[in-house]
Amino acid sequence: GDAAKGANVAKSCGTCHSFEQGGAKKQGPNLFGITTRGPGKAEGFNYSPSYKAAAAKGFAWDAATLQDYITDPTAFLSNKTGDAAARDKMTFKLAKPDERADVIAYLATLK
């Protein structure tokens, strides 16, 4: 992916997320450092019960996991938890594979 293009695509995510170190929590957690911290570790953010259950199963925010999550957050949580009713606050999906790759490349620079 192209991190510069990803920064542009991620602007649409800025409604719910911040991207700078120490950035405010919004509807979604601050994504600064997401690839270097464990799931559910954004300071001060109240994660959904389904997200907490998935995080308890253990995973890392590597490129493949981010790809699965931003493709369909609800399906990701259902698969991780084994609960078809699992839901998250994030319902936005990035449909285009190239945009997902670009956003993932951008997120990897935030550390």
Swiss-Prot record:
Lineage: Bacteria, Pseudomonadati, Pseudomonadota, Alphaproteobacteria, Rhodospirillales
Binding annotation for heme c: C13, C16, H17, M90
Domain of life per record: Bacteria
Protein name as catalogued: Cytochrome c-550
Free-text description of this protein's post-translational modifications in UniProt: Binds 1 heme c group covalently per subunit.
Keywords per UniProt: Electron transport, Heme, Iron, Metal-binding, Transport
SUPFAM superfamilies reported for this sequence: Cytochrome c
Source organism (scientific name): Novispirillum itersonii (Aquaspirillum itersonii)
GO function term, MF aspect, one: metal ion binding
